[in-house]
Curated annotation (Swiss-Prot):
Similarity comment: Belongs to the astroviridae polyprotein 1AB family.
Coiled-coil intervals: 130-222, 758-788
Catalytic activities: RNA(n) + a ribonucleoside 5'-triphosphate = RNA(n+1) + diphosphate
High-level lineage: Viruses, Riboviria, Orthornavirae, Pisuviricota, Stelpaviricetes
Protein name stated in the entry: Non-structural polyprotein 1AB
Claim: Acyltransferase is one of the keywords in the record: no
SUPFAM superfamilies, per database record: DNA/RNA polymerases (SSF56672), Trypsin-like serine proteases (SSF50494)
Entry's Gene Ontology BP terms: DNA-templated transcription; proteolysis; viral RNA genome replication; viral translational frameshifting
Length: 1638
């Protein structure tokens, strides 16, 4: 009953699926007889009549012929029905009168279609019966297996009881054995303890003896040190007692201000002096006046008036600024001698404040200095320095040996009155052998050279006789060093004696010389440590500490930078949907197979509406998940099948405060929107820092890995909050573990499974044998040998064993016709390729389109290679779906039967083509067919390659024999045809075990080698002898009869003629057939081919307008040009046309011819070759536009549209040879480093930029595709429409690409120029190359370019800026900074062409450095370097056909010309300012100084610079000379302007002026832009375009003089009047339109 129930459910689901298919737009199309245009006609009729009973009756027919929009004929059995719609709303169906309205040909086609449908139904019934039989057999086998399992369970119980008894016996014996072992172990342990205790006691005795000896030595050393310090202390305190402390304190100086002298007497004055000492301790608060304090820094003298002002209130006056004589003179000069007498008697002590604590400290320091000076004087007077030096030298000797050596030399130094310290230094430094020489030098200083020579001889001989081995060389080297040191010491000694250096000077001289000699070399010595494993490591003593400090600082900086930089986050817009409930609308997202949202969004609703794009479905609310501490919950909705394309979001691995992204919709729910910012996790609450909108409730918060963290609940006032749901979702959706006992033993469980498998193995094999017999029966039903081979392919190999891509592989060796459905379900991408496309940002729809395009291409290649007619393949999709549905269960049963078997079978994971290497050998002749297929693991790939080389010989196959040998590994793919194959060398490779051989009836001989983790190497071999009428297989037990007695042989490919045009030349066979095959035309109502053309003219039935083709008529109707519109049908997808070899990117290498002589190239440019091209060389005629007759020309004679001759091509090469640059990287290394840092700092927003997939890059598709593609296509859009993206993908993935060179196409720019430039043939050159090369550059740079466009308000580069709406004003005011600046305008001449190669390469490497680390793979690095190399070293094709090479400059037609020029401009400007700064100040400026004192804006080579006055003086002549001699770049003097204000300077063609409101606005070059009204560069299409051009000019000239605006207003008025007369509608422009834009 359960089986019947499941069958019923299956048929019920089948009926539901069939109903859904009938509701689809294409349902019923497979029944329609095909002719050209039938798809569009069918869709229009279905839309018009799809809901009428007549149309329903028509769709029930087996075959349908659509005669026209109102008439159709349907066949069901032998009845021919007629569908006729006299009115759109009332069509009729007549079931028996249709045969009278069709021709015999049409009737034959309908009969064929009807017969095909009936055959399909009969086949389905037959197949269904076979499916039912297989399922019944399978069910019986399962029942038998269950019975066997029950028996096995009973046996297991008996075995388990025996095992339990056996275990008890073993446990008892084990316990006794363990008891004996414990006793033995305890005994051994006690013995070991006694041995260890004895050894420890011995070691302690030795250690105590060593310590005792060390203490004795330490006491002796301490005694000597104590004696020395006692002597020093006695001397120091004795000398201090000699000092007179009273003389060190100067007497206080106290003055009384005027007005208080009469109240003071001498007694009081003495009291004040006493108070002065108290004043120093801040105890006496004076009432009024000044206190004179002693200072130690000279200050400005105080004037009399300043003194009176200070002393009118409590204040302090420094002693150095108080000069009584000067003050008295000033007073007498101002007030007279009489008044001034007695005014400056003395100062009264006043207030002592906290600010004068420093004064007390300075006084204490001064007193200390005086004490020290006095002590030092006493020391020198009594020659105590000699005593102190001697005592210190003896105390610091360190050991007795040095003490006894120095004592006599100190006595000698005292006796001869020579420096004691220098003598002690010599005794300590030089070896013992040199002591006699030192003594001799003291007594006889005039023989220094002889003495040094004798010392050197003595030390060298001593080293030779006293040392051994390599130490001799070291000692000899030391001898030389000691000798040099001895000479220096002798000179120092002579200087000391002559100059009578004091002790302090001797010590200072020695320390300075020692530090200069040693430096920091020994402190920073690198130590090499060799580890036991053979590795070495180097450590630096000081460097290690330095590195630790640097690393800690870097960590702090990185943390601060990370906190302020928003990381890149994957877009999750494909994972959200709109959720509509009864009370509101919110956002939902997919998690697993559910849609989650906030509960309040669907509150009160059991059913919610989910929307995603154009899909809108209903879904049921399954449950809610409560969230701790939250008033809201998470609602869980069922995922409808229609939303399976919505991508699920994975849970976050770690939840912490970080930058999170909220993915939601805009307020109108039209487009997805993302909000990124810093979010704080507070328990379960999530607080964000960005503004959200109403309707964002339920949106997911994702981390920078795109994983789910929380859900948005809403906005509470100014605070937007969400809730963390990671733990809640883990607890809710976590799968429950299977319950098992605590003492569960997995090994024991596996043993039971193995035992059960052995018991039931025979029964399973019996069932398998029965299934094999049924398979053999199905094989015998095959009516042709081709069907047999197809059946052999299906049943002989389980699906999924190997996964290959169709691109570039050879098809099966037999000549059998495959259907289109076979190709449309093939795997076109490996897992690796598919994952790479996902990581590069391709959506599911884009990947699906790319795969379908590859499938279409594979099908077309198959049809052309095998001369297969693809007629009738329009219904491939329905046939494929129906076949898959019928054969699904048969495939599953056959796969189970054909799996590898063993005693214990564990199904292994299927290995894909990427994961498992494979060798496939096929050799077929008329009498014999041999195949061998070997699949091995990755670790056996090398053995497989060697076996392949042994099997494939160098001998060619004889006539009538064909062979193919294929090898596929992870890194190599080989295909060899036409060579004799030695099948005896094809043997299996053992993994880690024996090779098991099996004979599977009806298939092949199979050898299996199984290793650990069920890894297997499988060899399948087959040897078939072909006789008349039979196929005999050696390894098969039963012969298989085949009705088709054709021999199986592979025909060698040979030239064939096209059956449509008769040509044997290679061409587009599909297009040829499409043009010449006759089809029924719905417009002509007759059979004809596209080559013959339509019989009657094609015209619109509404406006009677004629067209040359049906496509143009359809475009006319759909575009709405006429009032009557047809219903637009679906856009038909066209399979891409294979790209001919002569149009591919590197095809120019085959087209180039030897040089034929120069036509346009100058002498200094080398001619490489010649390629004939049919392009315009000279332009002598100007464009004539009749529409410009409506306007009056602007009067000017300066500008004109360009014309040129061949001379212009010669002239344009001058910019590449203006002047050669120097090696500025080596000569100006510090400047280069500074410039690099400034460029990195200026463009740091480009960091961690991403690579854009080549199919997602954006560029102008209407531009020329360059050579060789412009030979067939005028634009890239046309090329993509025909050929698709395949060549783009092949070039990027092909490793040989970096070994090829693209070709640049050169042409002159048609623009408005000065007439003298036109007369001088000075026309700008444009370079462009193949769009594939351009898009490779866009892969690396599109993200960076877009980021630069977003930074124009705060950065220098102005790509994407606008001068309107105050844009120019804001940028000019940014240049002002904090004022006090001057402005510099500079424009290079031929900027692009003169950029040094090394500078351009440097900027390009900086751009690669800004890429995210995940993109900096070796492959991407090689591809990027190849791209940059071809930007620098360009191979150029001229319209004259000449091919040359240029190795300088930035090509103007590359993807990032302006962005690169901006970065180079920043680099050069930094160098320019630093060069002037260095010249004027003798040092380089710092980065901070440059940022604070210089600002700039630039667009390509256009630059406006502001410099703070006093920072650097701008010297134009120096700048011009610098650019020429260092970089080889051209700057003219008249292109440099320096002003204090920006008014009058220009930027991007706009002269800066101030408007009446005080804002900075721009005025264009009026004569240049208005000259196009007389001499245009291209014609305008219509009057509307002319009006738009005039309005645009009027916007630009809003700030120009009034006569210019008046002129343009008149021209606009004239055009508007003309348009009104001709009934042409033009937009209205308001009165303040132009001014508001600025």
């Amino acid at each position: 009953m359960a089986q019947a129930g499941r069958s019923g459910d299956a048929f019920a689901s089948l009926d539901q699926r069939r109903e859904r298919q009938e509701e689809q737009a294409q349902s019923g199309l497979d029944k329609v007889f095909y002719f050209q245009g039938v798809v569009e006609l069918f869709n229009r009729m279905k839309i018009a009549y799809g809901r009428t009973p007549a149309w329903t009756a028509l769709m029930k027919c087996n075959a349908i012929y659509l005669k026209d929009f109102k008439t159709a004929v349907g066949v069901e059995g032998t009845r021919y029905g007629l569908f006729f719609a006299e009115e759109v709303t009332k069509p009729t169906w007549s079931p028996d009168i249709g045969a009278n309205l069709i021709t015999l040909g049409e009737k034959a086609c309908l009969d064929a279609q009807n017969a095909k449908y009936e055959r399909l139904q009969a086949s389905l019934k037959t197949t269904s019966g076979l499916v039912h039989q297989v399922m019944e057999k399978t069910r019986e086998a399962k029942e038998n297996l269950e019975k066997a399992n029950k028996i096995q369970e009973q046996l297991d119980k008996v075995i388990e009881s025996n095992k339990a008894l056996h275990r008890k016996i073993q446990e008892r014996n084990r316990e006794k054995m363990q008891e004996y072992m414990v006793r033995l172990h305890n005994t051994q342990k006690d013995r070991d303890d006694w041995v260890q205790r004895c050894s420890r006691l011995e070691q302690e005795n030795v250690t105590l003896q060593k310590r005792l000896k060390e203490k004795e030595n330490a006491l002796v050393s301490v005694g000597w040190d104590l004696l020395g310090w006692i002597v020093i202390s006695v001397l120091v305190f004795g000398l201090i007692s000699l000092a007179d402390a009273q003389n060190l304190t100067p007497p206080a100086k106290i003055v009384i201000t005027p007005g208080q002298a009469e109240f003071m007497d001498l007694a009081k004055l003495e009291k004040i002096q006493v108070r002065k000492y108290r004043l120093d301790s801040c105890e006496l608060p004076p009432e009024k006046g000044c206190v004179l304090y002693k200072d130690y820094l000279t200050t400005r003298p105080v004037s009399f008036l300043e003194l009176m002002a200070k002393c009118s209130k409590p204040d302090w006056v420094s002693e150095s600024s108080y000069n009584e004589t000067t003050l008295m003179e000033e007073c007498i000069q101002i007030f007279g001698a009489e008044w001034c007498e007695g005014k400056l008697v003395d100062l009264v002590p006043r207030k002592c404040g906290e600010q004068h604590v420093l004064v007390n400290i300075i006084e204490q320091i001064e007193k200390t200095r005086e004490v020290v000076t006095l002590i030092y004087g006493k020391v020198m007077s009594y020659r105590l320095d000699m005593w102190i030096t001697s005592i210190f030298s003896l105390v610091l000797a360190g050991n007795k040996e040095k003490l006894f050596k120095m004592a006599p030399f100190i006595f000698v130094a005292w006796f001869l009155n020579i420096p004691v310290f220098l003598t002690c230094v010599a005794v300590n430094i030089f070896p013992v052998v040199s002591l006699p020489f030192i003594l001799f030098q003291i007594f006889m200083p005039q023989f220094v050279l002889v003495n040094a020579f004798l010392l050197w001889l003595t030390l060298t001989l001593t080293a030779f006789y006293w040392s051994e081995g390599p130490k001799i060389l070291m000692e000899i080297s030391y001898a030389l060093v000691y000798t040099i040191g001895f000479v220096l010491w002798s000179l120092g000694l002579a200087v000391g004696v002559t100059l009578k250096l004091t002790m302090v000077h001797q010590i200072l001289m020695f320390c300075v010389v020692a530090a200069a000699i040693c430096g920091t070399k020994f402190a920073c010595t690198t130590i090499t440590v060799q580890h036991p494993d053979g590795t070495t490591a180097k450590y630096t003593r000081v460097g290690k500490l330095k590195n630790n400090v640097v690393n800690q600082c870097k960590k702090v900086v990185t943390t601060l930078q990370t906190r302020g930089v928003i990381p890149a986050t994957p877009a999750k817009t494909a994972s959200i949907v709109i959720v509509e409930g009864k009370n509101g609308t919110g956002v939902g997202f997919r998690f697993m197979n559910y849609i989650l949202t906030a509960e309040h969004v669907v509150q009160g609703s059991d059913i919610a509406t989910l929307k995603n794009g154009s899909v809108s479905v209903k879904s049921k609310v399954i449950k809610t998940i409560p969230i701790f501490e939250s008033v809201d919950n998470v609602a869980v909705l069922k995922l409808p099948p229609e939303l399976n394309s919505v991508k699920p979001i994975k849970l976050a691995k770690k939840v912490q405060s970080d930058y999170l992204t909220l993915t939601a919709y805009d307020p109108n729910f039209q487009h997805a929107a993302t909000f990124t910012g810093w979010c704080i996790i507070d328990g379960n609450w999530l607080n964000n820092s960005f503004d959200t909108k109403f309707g964002n409730s339920g949106a997911p918060y994702c981390d920078h890995d795109g994983r789910l963290v929380g859900i948005h609940l809403g906005t509470q006032g100014v605070l937007s909050q969400g809730i963390v749901i990671v733990d809640a979702l883990k607890n809710t959706f976590q799968l429950a573990d299977q319950c098992r006992p605590q003492n569960f033993d997995m090994d024991e469980f596996l043993e039971k499974v193995i035992a059960g498998t052995k018991v039931s193995h025979a029964a399973i094999l019996k069932e398998l044998e029965e299934l094999r017999e049924e398979v053999q029966f199905l094989k015998k039903k095959c009516v042709t040998y081709d069907d047999y081979w197809l059946c052999q392919t299906i049943f002989g190999q389980a699906k999924g064993k190997t996964k290959k891509t169709v691109r570039g592989r050879k098809h099966l060796v037999t000549k059998r016709a495959l259907g289109k459905g076979h190709f449309m379900k093939m795997r076109m991408l490996t897992d690796e390729e598919y994952q790479n496309m996902i990581e590069k940002g391709f959506s599911a729809e884009e990947i699906r389109e790319a795969v379908n395009a590859l499938r279409e291409q594979a099908w077309l290649n198959y049809c052309i290679d095998n001369d297969v007619d693809d007629e009738g393949e329009e219904d491939w999709y329905d046939d494929m779906v129906e076949t898959d549905r019928v054969n699904q269960e048969i495939d599953e049963a056959i796969e189970r039967a054909m799996e590898d078997r063993g005693e214990f079978y564990q199904k292994k994971s299927r290995l894909t083509f990427v994961e498992q290497a494979m060798m496939h050998l096929i050799q077929v002749s008329k009498e014999r067919s041999q195949t061998a297929k070997l699949e091995v693991q990755k670790e056996n790939e090398a053995q497989l390659v060697k076996m392949f080389e042994r099997c494939v010989t160098d001998e060619n196959t004889p006539e009538g024999t064909t062979s193919i040998a294929a090898l596929s590994t992870e890194d190599d793919v080989r295909l060899v045809e036409g060579k004799v194959i030695d099948f005896t060398k094809a043997k299996n490779i053992p993994v880690d075990g024996e090779i098991r051989r099996e004979i599977i009836p009806g298939t092949k001989c199979t050898e299996i080698s199984t290793g650990p983790e069920n890894k297997k190497n499988i060899l399948k071999k087959k040897d078939t002898h072909i006789a008349e009428g039979k196929v005999e297989t050696k390894s098969s037990q039963q012969p298989v009869d085949v009705k088709d007695d054709k021999p199986v042989a592979l025909e060698q490919r040979k030239p064939r003629a096209c059956k449509w045009c008769g040509s044997s030349q290679k061409h587009d066979y599909r297009e040829c057939r499409f043009q010449r095959e006759k089809r029924f035309c719905v417009y002509c109502a007759a059979m004809h081919s596209m080559f013959e053309g339509h019989i009657r003219p094609i015209e619109c039935t509404s406006c009677k307008k004629s067209f040359s083709g049906i496509e143009k008529l359809e475009d006319h109707v759909v575009s709405g040009e006429c009032q009557k519109k047809l219903i637009e049908g679906p856009v038909t997808t066209k399979a891409p046309t294979p790209v001919p070899d002569w149009l591919k990117i590197f095809a120019w290498e085959d087209d180039i011819l030897p040089p034929e002589g120069k036509t346009a190239l100058p002498e200094n440019v080398t001619l490489i070759g010649h390629i004939p091209v049919d392009k315009l060389v000279s332009r002598t005629k100007k464009v004539q536009d009749p529409l410009l007759g409506l306007v009056t020309p602007w009067k000017q004679d300066m500008y004109d549209s360009t014309t040129w001759t061949v001379k212009a091509y010669t002239k344009m090469f001058e910019k590449f040879h203006y002047h050669d640059p120097v090696d500025f990287v080596e000569q100006y290394a510090e400047f280069v480093l500074l410039c690099d840092n400034m460029v990195l700092r200026e463009h740091d927003y480009m960091a961690n930029s991403n690579i854009t997939p080549i199919m997602s890059t954006e560029k102008n598709v209407n531009s020329t595709p360059a050579y060789p593609k412009f030979q067939a296509y005028d634009s890239e859009a046309e090329y993509l429409e025909d050929c698709g993206w395949q060549e783009y993908l092949d070039v990027v993935s092909d490793p040989e690409t970096i070994n090829r060179r693209p070709l640049w196409w050169c042409f002159l720019k048609n623009e408005v120029l000065k007439r003298e430039k036109i007369e001088d043939s000075d026309i700008r050159m444009i370079l462009c190359t193949d769009p594939i090369f351009t898009r490779i550059g866009a892969m690396f740079e599109q993200d960076q370019n877009n980021r630069m466009k977003q930074q124009t308000e705060i950065r220098s580069a102005q790509v994407g800026w606008t001068p309107f709406f105050g844009g120019l004003d804001r940028r000019v005011r940014r240049l002002y900074g904090d004022g006090d600046r001057y402005f510099v305008e500079m424009d290079w001449t031929r900027y692009d062409g003169t950029i040094p190669k090394s500078l351009f390469w440097r900027i390009r490497q900086i751009r690669f450095f800004f890429l995210h680390d995940s993109h900096k793979t070796p492959k991407m690095r090689r591809l990027y370097n190849w791209y940059v190399k071809n930007l620098l070293e360009k191979i150029i094709l001229l319209p004259t056909g000449e091919v040359c090479q240029v190795k300088k400059g930035n090509p103007s037609g590359q993807f990032s010309t302006t962005v690169d020029n901006n970065m180079i401009n920043v680099w050069l400007t930094t160098f320019e300012v630093s060069y002037l700064f260095f010249k004027q100040r003798g040092r380089l400026p710092t980065e901070k100084e440059l940022q604070e004192n210089c600002s700039m804006i630039c667009y390509g080579d256009d630059r406006l610079l502001s410099i703070r006055k006093g920072f650097v003086e701008y010297e134009p002549d120096t700048v011009i000379d610098m650019y020429k001699n260092i970089f080889g770049m051209w700057v003219k003097r008249n292109n440099i302007k320096i002003q204090d204000t920006p008014e009058g300077l220009s930027f991007c063609g706009l002269t800066i002026v101030k408007s009446s409101t005080g804002a900075y606005v721009g005025v264009p070059n009026v004569n240049k832009i208005l000259s196009t009204l007389e001499n245009p560069v291209r014609r305008l299409p219509d009057v509307e375009s002319l009006w738009g051009k005039l309005v645009s000019l009027r916007i630009l000239c809003e700030n120009a003089p009034s006569n210019v605006k008046h002129f343009l207003d008149e021209q606009i008025s004239n055009v508007e009047e003309f348009a009104a007369r001709e009934n042409i509608q033009l937009p209205e422009v308001g009165p303040d339109f132009y001014s508001r834009i600025w």
